[in-house]
Amino acid sequence: MRNTVFLLGFWSVYCYFPAGSITTLRPQGSLRDEHHKPTGVPATARPSVAFNIRTSKDPEQEGCNLSLGDSKLLENCGFNMTAKTFFIIHGWTMSGMFESWLHKLVSALQMREKDANVVVVDWLPLAHQLYTDAVNNTRVVGQRVAGMLDWLQEKEEFSLGNVHLIGYSLGAHVAGYAGNFVKGTVGRITGLDPAGPMFEGVDINRRLSPDDADFVDVLHTYTLSFGLSIGIRMPVGHIDIYPNGGDFQPGCGFNDVIGSFAYGTISEMVKCEHERAVHLFVDSLVNQDKPSFAFQCTDSSRFKRGICLSCRKNRCNNIGYNAKKMRKKRNSKMYLKTRAGMPFKVYHYQLKVHMFSYNNSGDTQPTLYITLYGSNADSQNLPLEIVEKIELNATNTFLVYTEEDLGDLLKMRLTWEGVAHSWYNLWNEFRNYLSQPSNPSRELYIRRIRVKSGETQRKVTFCTQDPTKSSISPGQELWFHKCQDGWKMKNKTSPFVNLA
């Protein structure tokens, strides 16, 4: 029952309070005041905002609480003035306790940056409220973080440029407020699926924005699932990365939903996609040898069509901790595919397929699969997703990806699924026969395929071994081998890849 209420609560917030309509809640302006005590938190409770520097990799160790103005305590806690400083800011909570992701992120940062200060911003008393109240509290928490940073700046060797604020969900907007209120400019803010309800479409001073730090990078992982956007959809950083389109994440699909209902843990399913942003960031810290790349694109549809796999002019970037600051000021939306678990890295390929003489096609679209054979490994049968429709007597572009590094591609096999394998194809075949019964046979002529690797930027052309045998029909396959026919082969790698 509690799990159902969790979903309905998010839905009511999103539907009942459309973006920009909230006036009584005032997340933007006079947020009561810095000494506001939210309902249900007595004056004798622990501090509403605490700064806990983690000095041990043991999650059971509470660390050392910093106190603004207490320089001696700062020294006793082992704060390193010249090192990088990370502030981890959690989001809204139903339990009133830290979730497991926070300990994983702390540990990953400690392993990656051994001399760094890792500070957890504990605002659980203000986050363990109704969602609308927690939203109102983000501003005051941001002010407290800014106050701590202003005090640290009074120390001779401390630099705001070494500060990296990492905020999850509502915590991302807390980081935005902190960057807005602090005296100076924070080095970097990372937003991990910033919360959407009550922030979508509002003014930049009321949410995370590119103005809040020298570099703001954002991961969006839960923007459209089930018609409900828990994470914010709009771009709010210098680079906004949408893994798997920013909606359905691998491992959080319909089968997982059924299992969650059966065991009464629907809240775990809901947070699977929302929390995926955190795990992608952790992955970038612990799996340095397998960095994930994202590619600039105007929208998810074009990316799914395989159009956007270029690294020219800073059009691709690492994701997570390894993301690089872009030279240009305007926002960049970027996309990538991932696996269902760590390491999340996959290998993207753009396929440009020349298709000719698609006889008696009607409105039927072929169900095509490609198998890639490489020097290191071979792929599975990879579906060629038809996002719009097949263009006849033209070049069609597709996106496929593999979970393994195939090495240098050697050959490939194209398969047209027969009607017996798919009820959908059987219906289309029957409909096509009714519209054009005089010539039910169908053929597709494919002379060559060009493959471009997103990760290496290499381009290789493949041709049919026998130019006279380039036709394919349902239930048949075609083999392609490396060639130099039509396209010039390019083996140059992107200079960007060397940044990994």
Curated annotation (Swiss-Prot):
GO cellular component, one term: cell surface
Active site: 169, 193, 274
Entries under SUPFAM superfamilies matching the protein: alpha/beta-Hydrolases, Lipase/lipooxygenase domain (PLAT/LH2 domain)
Residues of the signal peptide: 1-20
Reactions catalysed: a triacylglycerol + H2O = a diacylglycerol + a fatty acid + H(+); a 1,2-diacyl-sn-glycero-3-phosphocholine + H2O = a 2-acyl-sn-glycero-3-phosphocholine + a fatty acid + H(+); 1,2,3-tri-(9Z-octadecenoyl)-glycerol + H2O = di-(9Z)-octadecenoylglycerol + (9Z)-octadecenoate + H(+); 1,2,3-tributanoylglycerol + H2O = dibutanoylglycerol + butanoate + H(+)
Domain PLAT: 347-482
Domain of life: Eukaryota
Keywords: Disulfide bond, Glycoprotein, Heparin-binding, Hydrolase, Lipid degradation, Lipid metabolism, Secreted, Signal
Glycosylation sites: 65, 80, 136, 359, 393, 491
Annotated S-S bridges: 64-77, 252-272, 297-316, 308-311, 463-483
InterPro entries named among the record's database cross-references: AB_hydrolase_fold, Lipase, Lipase_LIPH, Lipase_N, Lipo_Lipase, PLAT/LH2_dom, PLAT/LH2_dom_sf, TAG_lipase
Compartments in which it is found: Secreted
Top-level class of the enzyme under EC nomenclature: hydrolase
CDD domains, A to Z: Pancreat_lipase_like (cd00707), PLAT_LPL (cd01758)
A biological process from GO: reverse cholesterol transport
Gene3D superfamilies: alpha/beta hydrolase (3.40.50.1820), PLAT/LH2 domain (2.60.60.20)
Binding-site positions, heparin: 325-337
Tissue/organ expression: Expressed in placenta, lung, liver, testis and spleen.
One annotated GO molecular function: phospholipase A1 activity
Chief site of localization: secreted
Family: Belongs to the AB hydrolase superfamily. Lipase family.
Role played: Exerts both phospholipase and triglyceride lipase activities. More active as a phospholipase than a triglyceride lipase. Hydrolyzes triglycerides, both with short-chain fatty acyl groups (tributyrin) and long-chain fatty acyl groups (triolein) with similar levels of activity toward both types of substrates. Hydrolyzes high density lipoproteins (HDL) more efficiently than other lipoproteins.
Description of how the protein assembles with itself and partners: Head to tail homodimer.
Name this polypeptide is given: Endothelial lipase
Organism of provenance: Mus musculus (Mouse)
